[in-house]
Amino acid sequence: LTAIYYKSRATLPDKVRATQQDGFLFGEISGQQIVLEHNHKFLVDFVEGQKTGFFLDQRENRKLLGEFANGKNVLNTFCYTGGFSVYALKAGARLVHSVDASEKAIDLTRKNIELNGFDAEQHACVATDTFDFLKGKENQYDLIILDPPAFAKH
């Protein structure tokens, strides 16, 4: 164990957020770190990344995708780190498109695709609004991952 970083402020109500401080409880790391999940490598920024930097609650869903992606055309919307894209490519997807409105997320997805040994022939990243991208895309994909961020606070 190298470090423990406490990060909860982004998900807390404003009144509670003002009393909390994100930071290291043990050790310290900086910048992007490589993590391994089911033999897949991912660059993760625990400090500056969205929420925890990598959504661990989706790890079994990413693994499950691998059972269905072989030979398929896959669209990963709101891709963030490209986790689902990496799993689809490793499973033998014919083609994977990753879409996110954030240039930073698209850059991270590209890095994670390269980190796992894939090239641009099998994968394309698109930095645009997912809903705009989906218009007019009927029957182009066999599998679509649609895991949007929260659009409204509770």
Locate the predicted segments by residue:
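Conserved SAM-binding motif I beta-strand of class I
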Residues: 95-100
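Non-catalytic substrate-recognition/targeting regions of SAM-dependent transferases
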Residues: 1-54, 63
